[in-house]
Amino acid sequence: RLIADDAVEIKRIADRRLIGSCPEIIRYLIELRGIGILNVKELFGVGSVKEQKTVDLVIKLEVWDGKADSYDRLGLNEEYMDILGNKVQLNTIPVRPGRNVAMICESAAMTNRQKKMGKNTAQDFANRIGK
């Protein structure tokens, strides 16, 4: 579901909870280069948007430099970012034309959720191979 496109407002609620939302003026809107401004709620229905959501993962997309060694391939090295005094997991993901960025981001979010529930597939794999 879309919460915000380019501009995300983040508020700290209580000690450890961050909430992300969108400024009213651009709520439900995304810019799609070559097409223009789209209203996601009107195009895809109310089930495709949400007013706010807890922020527990930051995904940084960067152009892939072609060097395989410059990115964590197993998922064992965790990076964090400070947002309003809260430590939030940061995933830096290399992208290039042809990659399904939506699927990659969804996979990162699901993996993050799985880790919070106590399941770390990367660590399980490392244990299997004795790393």
Predicted regions mapped to residue ranges:
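Conserved nucleotide-sensing/catalytic segment adjacent to the nucleotide-binding pocket
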Residues: 2-63
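Conserved NTP phosphate-binding and transfer environment spanning the P-loop NTPase/kinase superfamily
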Residues: 52-131
